[in-house]
């Protein structure tokens, strides 16, 4: 298993809409993420900066690099493009984050 983190940027005033859309995430998108090896995916919001912080755990044999070729992934990105920073192809602008601390368990 591997954990990665990245930052995205939400457009101002779009938190509720972002949460609403994710509360109704398409089952076929959930299936695609699971099939690609995603085991846990959490997104946090910083209201002061409109930054979204994503933490994703995936298996070591993940196929996440293939997700952009899936119709459901492209459609989701198109659906989300009006409320967050994206590239010209509607891919979310993501800034990878580097780990600086990890506490697995208390002894």
From Swiss-Prot:
Which residues does substrate bind?
Answer: 18, 41, 76-77
Q: Which GO terms describe its biological process?
A: rhamnose catabolic process
Keyword Cytoplasm present in the record's keywords: the answer is yes
Q: Which GO CC terms are listed, alphabetically?
A: cytoplasm
**Function in brief:** Involved in the anomeric conversion of L-rhamnose.
Recorded family membership: Belongs to the rhamnose mutarotase family.
Protein name per Swiss-Prot or TrEMBL? L-rhamnose mutarotase
UniProt source species: Paraburkholderia phytofirmans (strain DSM 17436 / LMG 22146 / PsJN)
In the UniProt record, the gene name given for this protein reads rhaM
